[in-house]
Structures are given as structure tokens and as C-alpha cells.
Amino acid sequence: MRLILLGAPGAGKGTQANFIKEKFGIPQISTGDMLRAAVKAGTPLGVEAKGYMDAGKLVPDALIIGLVKERLKESDCANGYLFDGFPRTIAQADAMKEAGVAIDYVLEIDVPFSEIIERMSGRRTHPASGRTYHVKFNPPKVEGHDDVTGEPLIQRDDDKEETVKKRLEVYEAQTKPLITYYGDWAQRGEENGLKAPQYRKISGLGSVEEIRERAFGALK
């Protein structure tokens, strides 16, 4: 099972990624984790990546793909792997294809932006404990205060409506085109000797369990 998970920030990809990893016994491939590990280990690619990072520059796609190919050779990838948050752009998707990185499924978790804004902007956090609430879906007993300590709750900057909207705008511009990219490739079939992935789209609305069953059903 080799798959890419697509969906907007706040669509619930992280939660479903954990279920999928557990069910199929596959690792989640995080480019951030790979970069940090390569830099720490001092591999040739890691040293090169560190140069860009220290200069405050983005690590080039070609270097990231090199790290991906190294990572996929490790034994825990024998049964497959799951990409969440990569590729983010058409250029990265093209680079993966050219590098011969095989993908069986592209699974999109679809949630309307209005729902995502409500989900994320309604979150409230108790800073000391990390306890989280939601003004609509999981409200505290006393509005604006932690159930255990009674201390005030905060809204993290990441959860503020204007921040959420900006993240969704970036997704719309950069990552959403991947949905068309993989959908079109699935229709065209094999390219460059690489089998086209099957493209599946599920609704990300409903309970966590309902979405999990939809995801498992789509990956049969």
C-alpha cells in the first residue's frame, strides 16, 4: 500500500493517516523528519540540505526527492508507505514521477472550506496543560475557562480565522492543483513505465469513525 493523502489544512488528514498506518503496517513519510534525520546523521544529502537551511533558503525539490528515495529503501517501507503533506506542488509531483516513486492510491479527504474555518477558529486551548476545547463541538463547562483549573483559555494564533483563511488560500493556489494532476494521470494510465495511481475522494464530514470506514473502503 503506497499512497498520498491529500486535503486542506484542518481536513483531518493526520487522524486518518494514523488509522491507515496502523491498518496496513506502513510508515508515514515526513519530509521534515527526513531532513532533520539526514542533517543529524551528516549524510551527503543532509550536509547539502543543511547549507540551504542555515542560509534560510528552501531546500530544492531535487534534494528532497533524493532523501525520499533513500528513505523508501529502508526495511519498514517493504509493505508500502504513506505521504502526508508531500508533494505540495505540481513540480514536486513531477519530480516524484521522474524519480520513479511508485504510488498505488491518491486519497483526497474533502471538507468544505467553511467547515474547516468553523472547526479551526473554534478551537480553544489551556496553555499550561495543552487541553483543547471547541466553542461549538466540545465547549468547556464555563465559557472561556479550563474545566480542571478554571484558568482562562486562549485561541492560538494558528487557529485565528484570518490565519486559517490564509493557509487555505495557500492550499488553494499550491496544493489543490494536485487533485487535478493525479485525477488526470489516473485517467491517462501508465506514464514513463510508472503505473498511474488510483484516485479516490471521500467526504471528511461526519464522525472520525465514519471517515475512517470511508477511507478503508476507498483503499480496497
From Swiss-Prot:
Gene3D superfamilies xrefs: P-loop containing nucleotide triphosphate hydrolases (3.40.50.300)
Enzyme Commission (EC) number: 2.7.4.3
Annotated stretches, region: LID: 122-159
Residues annotated as binding ATP: G10, A11, G12, K13, G14, T15, R123, T132, Y133, G206
Molecular function as annotated in GO: adenylate kinase activity; ATP binding
UniProt pathway annotation: Purine metabolism; AMP biosynthesis via salvage pathway; AMP from ADP: step 1/1
Main location class: cytoplasm
Keyword check for Oxidoreductase: no
Binding positions (AMP): T31, R36, K57, L58, V59, G85, F86, P87, R88, Q92, R156, R167
Entry superkingdom: Bacteria
Record-level GO BP terms: AMP salvage
Catalytic activity: AMP + ATP = 2 ADP
Enzyme category, top tier: transferase
Keywords from the named record: ATP-binding, Cytoplasm, Kinase, Nucleotide biosynthesis, Nucleotide-binding, Transferase
Cited InterPro entries: Adenyl_kin_sub, Adenylat/UMP-CMP_kin, Adenylat_kinase_CS, Adenylate_kinase_lid-dom, P-loop_NTPase
Pfam families xrefs: ADK, ADK_lid
Ranges where the record places region NMP: 30-59
Role description: Catalyzes the reversible transfer of the terminal phosphate group between ATP and AMP. Plays an important role in cellular energy homeostasis and in adenine nucleotide metabolism.
Quaternary context: Monomer.
Domain remark from Swiss-Prot or TrEMBL: Consists of three domains, a large central CORE domain and two small peripheral domains, NMPbind and LID, which undergo movements during catalysis. The LID domain closes over the site of phosphoryl transfer upon ATP binding. Assembling and dissambling the active center during each catalytic cycle provides an effective means to prevent ATP hydrolysis.
PANTHER family per UniProt: NUCLEOTIDE KINASE
Family classification: Belongs to the adenylate kinase family.
Database matches in HAMAP family: Adenylate_kinase_Adk (MF_00235)
Protein name (Swiss-Prot/TrEMBL): Adenylate kinase
Organism: Burkholderia lata (strain ATCC 17760 / DSM 23089 / LMG 22485 / NCIMB 9086 / R18194 / 383)
